[in-house]
Amino acid sequence: MGKRKPKSPIEGRWHIVSMTAWDVEETVEELQPFIEFERNDGGQFQFGCVYGEMDCRPTERDGKPAVEFSWEGHDEDEQVFGRGWTSLEGDQLEGMIFFHHGDESGFVAERAEG
């Protein structure tokens, strides 16, 4: 059995508070947009009708903790795929989510309470 990895400062649930391509405020009434990173290099995110499950790899960007990921999921009834990254900037995450052959958006997220 391998050693347990140390907890990443990015691990856990984060509330997406802004996106460059979509208005987060319009989706908060349905569900608080989030991105969540798990210890097992997995995770998920949801904003509006988009839900994705991630395969994550910890890394660094400019000397700061970061995660790069590929993802697959759905946008309403359509299957979608993509990639993305995020890095820890102070007490927030900043990153990008890309849809293969489609849209992209920057995002900012704050750690969820509790």
What are these regions (language model features)?
Residues 1-3, 48-54, 93:
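Generic detector of contiguous secondary-structure segments
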Residues 2-9, 13-19, 25, 34, ...:
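Beta-sheet ligand-binding and adhesion/scaffold domains
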Residues 24-64:
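N-terminal glycine/threonine-rich, aromatic-flanked beta-hairpin/loop signature
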